[in-house]
Structure formats: structure tokens, C-alpha cells
């Protein structure tokens, strides 16, 4: 229920923002095929992980993407859940479409993550551990030109190195989507 309220608040903020606010945040940093509409955005991400997401543009087509949240993983009868922190460096090489209402940039990047989790076997808590991982996110961002919002869809390839009771590596494919409000 709280999640619905959060989405409703973000929607009301977006609808209450004028076109002048959106135009004020527009900028161009050169002749790139994709030019970011804002510098710093903050929002919600759902999927793997679920939590807060932020994006900070270093130039018109390069950004830092970061987040904090929880992630839930199930492998046969075992499951892991816990705190997830990540940081990615993103490239936005091109936009699939540029029209007056929105841009649709493709992005790819690389980064890392820390995952502090509890491990469960059946109904019993088995142990806790952590993983350090390398990430390669691929995604699309629906970057609206007239309101300071973007909606993103992302697939991330992850290689985790697990530490604690069992040292090993694992490969994952994770998906998420979310919405961000741009402050400038």
C-alpha cells in the first residue's frame, strides 16, 4: 500500500511541474546524439533490486547510476535476501527516438555491487554472507522533455563472488524498472 502512495506522490509532482521548469532544466553539452535533460535525478526502482535509485550526469551522455535497496534471490530450495548497494558508470551512445515530448536513449555501462544477505535453507536461517559483484547494465530510459521525469527499464548481467561460509562465484541476470524525478 505504501508503494502505491509513493507512486501517486511522484505522479502528482510530475503533473504539477510546469513546462517552464522542464525547459529550465534542459541543457546541451555539445554535439552528442543524446543530450541529457537534467543533471541529478532520484527515484524508485522495482525488481532486482527494489529500493532508491539515483543518476548523476557527468556530461550529456555519461552518467553515474547508483542505488540502495533490497534484493531477493531464490535458488532451488534456498533463498537469499538482504541489503544491496551498487554504482555504475553509464554511456548513452544514441537515442532511439527524439521527438518534442520525449527521448528514448539506450544505455550500457559497467560497475560494481555489494550484497549483504541472509541465507535460508527451507524455513531455517542457515547463515549470512556477502557478495562482491561486477555489473553490466543495459537499458532504455523514457526521458520526458516537458516534465522532469524519466522511466527506465534495465537488464543487468552480474558476476558475484560470494564470501562467508561458502566461497564461490555465480552469474545472474537481473531486471528492474523505475521512475526518477529530475531536480535540475
Give the location of each predicted region:
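Cleavable N-terminal export/targeting peptides
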Residues: 1-34
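Short glycine/proline- and aromatic-enriched beta-strand/turn motifs that initiate or cap beta-hairpins
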Residues: 21-76, 80, 84, 184
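Short, aromatic- and cysteine-enriched interfacial helices/patches
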Residues: 24, 94-96, 159
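Residues that define the transmembrane beta-barrel architecture of outer-membrane proteins
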Residues: 36-38, 46-50, 79-85, 104, ...
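Glycine-centered flexibility sites
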Residues: 43, 47, 51, 109-111, ...
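Outer-membrane beta-barrel domain signature
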Residues: 50, 68-69, 75-76, 124, ...
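Gram-negative (and chloroplast) outer-membrane scaffold detector with strong preference
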Residues: 56-151
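Predominantly the C-terminal beta-signal and adjacent terminal strand-loop region
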Residues: 145-184
Amino acid at each position: 500500500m505504501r508503494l502505491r502512495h509513493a507512486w501517486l506522490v511522484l505522479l502528482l509532482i510530475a503533473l504539477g511541474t510546469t513546462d517552464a521548469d522542464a525547459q529550465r532544466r534542459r541543457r546541451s553539452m555539445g554535439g552528442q546524439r543524446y543530450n541529457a535533460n537534467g543533471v541529478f535525478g532520484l527515484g524508485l526502482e522495482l525488481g532486482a533490486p527494489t529500493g532508491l535509485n539515483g543518476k548523476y550526469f557527468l556530461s550529456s551522455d555519461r552518467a553515474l547510476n547508483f542505488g540502495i535497496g533490497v534484493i531477493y534471490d531464490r535458488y532451488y530450495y534456498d533463498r537469499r535476501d538482504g541489503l544491496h548497494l551498487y554504482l555504475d558508470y553509464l554511456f548513452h551512445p544514441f537515442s532511439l527516438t527524439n521527438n518534442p515530448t520525449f527521448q528514448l536513449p539506450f544505455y550500457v555501462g559497467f560497475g560494481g555491487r555489494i550484497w549483504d544477505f541472509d541465507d535460508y535453507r527451507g524455513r531455517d536461517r542457515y547463515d549470512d554472507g556477502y557478495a562482491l559483484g561486477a555489473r553490466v547494465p543495459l537499458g532504455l530510459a523514457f526521458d520526458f522533455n516537458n516534465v522532469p521525469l524519466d522511466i527506465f527499464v534495465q537488464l543487468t548481467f552480474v558476476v558475484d563472488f560470494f564470501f562467508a561460509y561458502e566461497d564461490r562465484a555465480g552469474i545472474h541476470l537481473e531486471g528492474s524498472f523505475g521512475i526518477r524525478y529530475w531536480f535540475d
